[in-house]
């Protein structure tokens, strides 16, 4: 049976700030989705102040009816958010009306269409207070780094390598890179998660494994309106990464862009399902929703980051967060200017600085005339 799994998320309001959605907001989203006859099954939850809708159906990816259902559900949530005076009501809905596809309209989208296996397993990773590039490092560990994932050695399909599709989010273009031939190029791209992000992964013979949301909100709105808060789908088991291999790629809380006002680097903390965002400077968080599926019917989710061992990972993330925040505003605690310029306050400060700058007197020709040499 050919099934599509669509995971669509949006921030449409939080209690007292960017914390978590209200029960009224969630109920409004659930009522709208539950009333639809388009779906086989669905699950609705939240990560921080982002609501995610996981849907199964047979209509394929980028389907207008499915995307409109999610859009309408988020609009219903926005209506309640405004009635309740929630902060950031409708924040991620950057267009006035639906235009056939929620991509480019604010919500994050990850979708996979595939022939369902007899025991289909997949995990949804939903993040808050960060950007799509936050998944680059876990994806690298999952599909490239055999020190992190022994499956890349002992599993025949994974050992053959996968195809990683990488998007240049600043220029809206993609590259199809193949392991193991393109390994250095993949690594060079993933060095800068603010620009190059993994959009999807497939086997060398074209079987889809993973899909991730890639929209940057400031690219759509032209100014800072909140972090992008990505979501991704990863099929697991058999010829794909084991569920444990996929999950363990989040056990080293790496530094990601995001945090309060989207202006800092902080570690990505794995948290339990339906966790609010912290008000301890808003540490970026990620949840793992582990599902089984048969004929499009969902069982789960199991809370992938709920077991006791993840408490120690959370303590590591907390220590790293405190260490970074002790550096204050000095880079790399804060983002590079290219990312901060979308914040109006930062732009205005830079305009003042620029107005006070005067050129240096001519000090002779620039450069030494030496040819380029590789760094030692």
UniProtKB/Swiss-Prot annotation:
<dbReference type="InterPro" id="IPR002803">
    <property type="entry name" value="FBPase_V"/>
</dbReference>
<dbReference type="InterPro" id="IPR036076">
    <property type="entry name" value="FBPase_V_sf"/>
</dbReference>
<keyword id="KW-0456">Lyase</keyword>
<keyword id="KW-0312">Gluconeogenesis</keyword>
<feature type="binding site">
    <location>
        <position position="49"/>
    </location>
    <ligand>
        <name>Mg(2+) 1</name>
    </ligand>
</feature>
<keyword id="KW-0460">Magnesium</keyword>
<feature type="binding site" description="in other chain">
    <location>
        <position position="342"/>
    </location>
    <ligand>
        <name>beta-D-fructose 1,6-bisphosphate</name>
    </ligand>
</feature>
<dbReference type="GO" id="GO:0004332">
    <property type="term" value="F:fructose-bisphosphate aldolase activity"/>
</dbReference>
<keyword id="KW-0119">Carbohydrate metabolism</keyword>
<feature type="active site" description="Proton acceptor; for FBP phosphatase activity">
    <location>
        <position position="11"/>
    </location>
</feature>
<comment type="similarity">
    <text>Belongs to the FBP aldolase/phosphatase family.</text>
</comment>
<feature type="binding site">
    <location>
        <position position="50"/>
    </location>
    <ligand>
        <name>Mg(2+) 2</name>
    </ligand>
</feature>
<dbReference type="GO" id="GO:0016491">
    <property type="term" value="F:oxidoreductase activity"/>
</dbReference>
<feature type="binding site">
    <location>
        <begin position="237"/>
        <end position="238"/>
    </location>
    <ligand>
        <name>beta-D-fructose 1,6-bisphosphate</name>
    </ligand>
</feature>
<feature type="active site" description="Schiff-base intermediate with DHAP; for FBP aldolase activity">
    <location>
        <position position="227"/>
    </location>
</feature>
<feature type="binding site">
    <location>
        <position position="227"/>
    </location>
    <ligand>
        <name>Mg(2+) 3</name>
    </ligand>
</feature>
<keyword id="KW-0479">Metal-binding</keyword>
<feature type="binding site">
    <location>
        <position position="228"/>
    </location>
    <ligand>
        <name>Mg(2+) 3</name>
    </ligand>
</feature>
<feature type="binding site">
    <location>
        <position position="229"/>
    </location>
    <ligand>
        <name>Mg(2+) 2</name>
    </ligand>
</feature>
<feature type="binding site">
    <location>
        <position position="18"/>
    </location>
    <ligand>
        <name>dihydroxyacetone phosphate</name>
    </ligand>
</feature>
<dbReference type="Pfam" id="PF01950">
    <property type="entry name" value="FBPase_3"/>
</dbReference>
<feature type="active site" description="Proton donor/acceptor; for FBP aldolase activity">
    <location>
        <position position="224"/>
    </location>
</feature>
<comment type="subunit">
    <text>Homooctamer; dimer of tetramers.</text>
</comment>
<feature type="binding site" description="in other chain">
    <location>
        <position position="129"/>
    </location>
    <ligand>
        <name>beta-D-fructose 1,6-bisphosphate</name>
    </ligand>
</feature>
<feature type="binding site">
    <location>
        <position position="229"/>
    </location>
    <ligand>
        <name>Mg(2+) 3</name>
    </ligand>
</feature>
<comment type="function">
    <text>Catalyzes two subsequent steps in gluconeogenesis: the aldol condensation of dihydroxyacetone phosphate (DHAP) and glyceraldehyde-3-phosphate (GA3P) to fructose-1,6-bisphosphate (FBP), and the dephosphorylation of FBP to fructose-6-phosphate (F6P).</text>
</comment>
<feature type="binding site">
    <location>
        <position position="91"/>
    </location>
    <ligand>
        <name>Mg(2+) 1</name>
    </ligand>
</feature>
<feature type="binding site" description="in other chain">
    <location>
        <position position="87"/>
    </location>
    <ligand>
        <name>beta-D-fructose 1,6-bisphosphate</name>
    </ligand>
</feature>
<feature type="binding site">
    <location>
        <position position="18"/>
    </location>
    <ligand>
        <name>Mg(2+) 1</name>
    </ligand>
</feature>
<feature type="region of interest" description="Disordered">
    <location>
        <begin position="357"/>
        <end position="376"/>
    </location>
</feature>
<feature type="binding site" description="in other chain">
    <location>
        <position position="261"/>
    </location>
    <ligand>
        <name>beta-D-fructose 1,6-bisphosphate</name>
    </ligand>
</feature>
<feature type="binding site" description="in other chain">
    <location>
        <position position="18"/>
    </location>
    <ligand>
        <name>beta-D-fructose 1,6-bisphosphate</name>
    </ligand>
</feature>
<dbReference type="GO" id="GO:0042132">
    <property type="term" value="F:fructose 1,6-bisphosphate 1-phosphatase activity"/>
</dbReference>
<feature type="binding site">
    <location>
        <position position="228"/>
    </location>
    <ligand>
        <name>Mg(2+) 4</name>
    </ligand>
</feature>
<feature type="binding site">
    <location>
        <position position="11"/>
    </location>
    <ligand>
        <name>Mg(2+) 1</name>
    </ligand>
</feature>
<feature type="binding site">
    <location>
        <position position="129"/>
    </location>
    <ligand>
        <name>dihydroxyacetone phosphate</name>
    </ligand>
</feature>
<keyword id="KW-0378">Hydrolase</keyword>
<dbReference type="GO" id="GO:0006094">
    <property type="term" value="P:gluconeogenesis"/>
</dbReference>
<feature type="binding site">
    <location>
        <position position="49"/>
    </location>
    <ligand>
        <name>Mg(2+) 2</name>
    </ligand>
</feature>
<feature type="binding site" description="in other chain">
    <location>
        <begin position="100"/>
        <end position="101"/>
    </location>
    <ligand>
        <name>beta-D-fructose 1,6-bisphosphate</name>
    </ligand>
</feature>
<comment type="pathway">
    <text>Carbohydrate biosynthesis; gluconeogenesis.</text>
</comment>
<protein>
    <recommendedName>
        <fullName>Fructose-1,6-bisphosphate aldolase/phosphatase</fullName>
        <ecNumber>3.1.3.11</ecNumber>
        <ecNumber>4.1.2.13</ecNumber>
    </recommendedName>
</protein>
């Amino acid at each position: 049976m050919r099934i599509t799994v669509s995971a669509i998320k949006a921030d449409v309001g939080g209690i007292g700030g960017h914390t978590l959605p209200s029960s009224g907001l969630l109920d409004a989203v659930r009522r709208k989705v539950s009333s639809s006859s388009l779906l086989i099954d669905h699950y609705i939850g939240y990560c921080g102040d982002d609501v995610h809708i996981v849907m199964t159906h047979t209509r394929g990816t980028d389907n207008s009816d499915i995307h409109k259902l999610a859009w309408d559900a988020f609009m219903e949530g926005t209506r309640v958010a405004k009635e309740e005076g929630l902060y950031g009501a409708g924040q991620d809905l950057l267009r006035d009306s639906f235009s056939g596809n929620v991509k480019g309209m604010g919500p994050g989208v990850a979708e996979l269409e595939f022939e369902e296996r007899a025991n289909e397993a997949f995990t949804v990773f939903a993040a808050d207070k960060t950007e799509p590039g936050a998944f680059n490092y876990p994806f690298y560990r999952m599909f490239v780094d055999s020190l992190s994932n022994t499956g890349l050695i002992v599993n025949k399909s994974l050992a053959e390598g996968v195809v990683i599709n990488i998007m240049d989010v600043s220029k809206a273009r993609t590259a199809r890179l193949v392991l193991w031939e393109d390994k250095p190029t993949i690594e060079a791209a993933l060095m800068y998660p603010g620009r190059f992000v993994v959009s999807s992964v497939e086997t060398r013979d074209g079987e889809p494994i993973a899909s991730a949301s890639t929209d940057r909100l400031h690219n759509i709105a032209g100014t800072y309106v909140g972090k992008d808060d990505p979501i991704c789908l990863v099929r697991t088991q058999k010829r794909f990464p084991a569920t444990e291999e996929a999950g363990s790629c989040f056990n080293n809380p790496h530094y990601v862009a995001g945090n309060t006002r989207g202006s800092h680097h902080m570690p990505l903390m794995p948290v339990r399902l339906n966790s609010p965002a912290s008000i301890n400077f808003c540490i970026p968080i990620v949840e793992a929703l582990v599902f089984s599926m048969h004929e499009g019917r969902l069982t789960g989710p199991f809370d992938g980051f709920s077991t006791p061992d993840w408490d120690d990972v959370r303590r590591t993330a907390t220590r790293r967060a405190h260490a970074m925040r002790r550096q204050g505003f000095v880079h790399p605690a804060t983002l590079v200017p290219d990312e901060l310029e979308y914040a109006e306050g930062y732009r205005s400060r830079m305009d003042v600085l620029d107005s006070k700058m005067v050129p240096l007197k001519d000090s002779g020709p620039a450069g030494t005339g030496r040819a380029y040499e590789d760094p030692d």
